[in-house]
Amino acid sequence: MGERRFSNQQIDRLLRPKSVAVIGASDRKGALGATLLNNLVQYEFSGDIYPVNPKRDELLGLKVYHEVAELPEGIDCAVLAIPRPFVIDTVRQLAQRGCGAVVIYSAGFSEAGEEGMKDQLELAAIAAEYGMVIEGPNCLGCTNYVERVPLTFVETNMQTPPKGTRAVGIASQSGALAAVLATALHPRGLYVSSSVSTGNEAASGVEDYVEWLVDDEDTHVIAMYVESLRRPKAFIAAARRAHAAGKPIVMLHPGKSNKAQESAATHTGAMAGDYALMKTKLAREGVIFADTLEELADITEIALRCRALPGANMAVLGESGALRGLAFDIAEDIGLDLIHLDDDNSPALRAILPDFVPVSNPTDITALGLSEPEIYTKVLTALLEDERIGSVVASIIQSDPITSGIKFPHIIKVLDGGTFAKPLVFAGVDEGATVPKEYIDGLRKVGIPWFPSTERAYRAIARLADLSKRDLADNSGDPIVVPGLDAVSGVVPEYKAKELLRPLGIAFPPSQFAANAEAAAAAARAIGYPVVMKAQAAALGHKSDAGGVILNLKTDDEVRDAFARIYGNVEAYDRSIALDGVLIEKMGKMGTEMIVGAKNDPQWGPVVLAGFGGVTAEILKDVKLFTPEMDAAAVQRGLLELKQAPILKGYRGAPALDVAALAELIVQIGRVMAGNPSIREIDLNPVIIHPAGEGVAALDALMLVER
């Protein structure tokens, strides 16, 4: 569920402890307990330290306790640097003595098989019984850099953020990635407030620490490495709070290359994998995704250093026509919007630039800056003052220390004391150029991130600017309950699915079910020729593969003959499939084939998939995911982002298609999924989209109902 498991006060006993017990303390070089104890002493932990080792009386000038039973009651946090077999009993003893939090380094739990999972569940039970926060097992520990609390077994570079400095909080399921990210940020002059590696998450997960970081006044951005969210609804609640608090969450989540499940019952199940579902749901909560660790650090830097997040419509100051062309290519590849600027719509720029330099975006000032370096200040200021522009990039040839010395001071001057509510980012175009550190530090001091390459800057800006284009409002309508759903279960064949969905306003062609040839002929006459005949059985997921679809039947005799042929085809395809009968349906005019499907994930909730469909849907995968919170206008915008969207708009003289009707269908299916958790999947494929004003028609329907 979405409820918080721990209060901030409970997490405080882990991340702001007043007392720490080191179980397995040592002075043996390389021992986990030795490094941990040395960290606490070296960085002058302000609270009480209680080393525990049955064979020692003193370590680093501290009294050593021989067993947990000797410890005072109510210690805030205990860190276990002991072998796995001793962990459970030790945790239980600590819980009984009122210890508030435990860090478990030891591996060999859920990742090690059935026995390890059993022990991990026992840890979870102890935590639940005593209200204890357990970090791990199989984790690197945690560090509060602000209050200098290093509860980790690796040597720590304790860089405490100066008072008033914006800092990032790290919540990572990988201890190594948490450490690497902190290491990557420090040379950039960026600070970490607190870092937590959650490991196997026996009793606390990343969502618990995000909740704490949202309320932490020393944290301004939250960076995450996540492999699997075990409590999605709780994380969504935490992400929603972070967005409301103005604290961006930047997440690196591997998994987009995972193969879809081949055994899925419908196209939708095969295509809407967990990664895509997760990303769709979290994007609506304001989460920003990175594709690489470097990109995670780059996005974090802009979010921390700049005075505001990038908006849509980027403007670029450049110094080369050739590089201007490359900028267009990079921007198009990553979906970054470059605002159009010209002499007519940008009078402020026109007044600044010499006659031989046209106003454009990127603005190419050529080598003018070497002789008139104040041009950098003037142009960048004009771009920042333009309300149409959401972010500005100085794309600069750095060359050498002398050239940098001419250019950098005039770029730094733009923000030195300025109050622009949009980011200015420096992007070198000559990665590897020798640039004195003092110039880079000067940029950073006034809030200008420095990137050695244009592409890195563009990608990070694109990820952040995308947030400004998202419709995060909850515009969901009332959930729709399907009458008669209690009478079906498992895979629901087409004819029954249409019987259930048609009364809700889902557009299907006229159709009738028939169990024998004469009934089929009578149905065809009632509907009106020509008709299509389709085999019907719960076990027949892909009718066309089995020869179970015959088109354009025009007479009673053709219908009777088709009935026999379909039964023969299906029997030849798979003798185990027993047909319920056939569906007789009116042949309608053809058009562009789309797919509309939906999935009710037991953890993430409902999501609707839509895009270009037909038998090639799983090959082309030109689809998008939509959530029930989106209204028809937001869905339309999403549909027009599909790769084949020009077809929807009208291509090569063809009419524009009824995207509005398709969007309404998607919204309706989303409301159906929201109102019926037992519907695991719906697949409408194909859905024919007709010219604008003529609507859509779902030609096939399949449902999966599970209770």
From Swiss-Prot:
Listed InterPro entries: ATP-grasp (IPR011761), ATP_grasp_subdomain_1 (IPR013815), CoA-bd (IPR003781), NAD(P)-bd_dom_sf (IPR036291), Succ_CoA_lig_flav_dom (IPR032875), Succinyl-CoA_synth-like (IPR016102)
Uses: Catalyzes the activation of ferulate via CoA-thioesterification, a first enzymatic step for conversion of the lignin-derived ferulate into high value chemicals, such as vanillin and bioplastics.
Record key words, sorted: ATP-binding, Ligase, Nucleotide-binding
Matches recorded under SUPFAM superfamilies: Glutathione synthetase ATP-binding domain-like, NAD(P)-binding Rossmann-fold domains, Succinyl-CoA synthetase domains
UniProt keyword annotation of Ligase present: yes
Positions contributing to ATP binding: H267, A524, R525, A526, I527, G528, Y529, P530, V531, V532, M533, K534, A535
Top EC class of this enzyme: ligase
A molecular function (GO) term: metal ion binding
Assembly, per entry: Homodimer.
Entry protein name: Trans-feruloyl-CoA synthase FCS1
Protein source organism: Unknown prokaryotic organism
Lineage, uppermost ranks: Bacteria, environmental samples
Name of encoding gene: FCS1
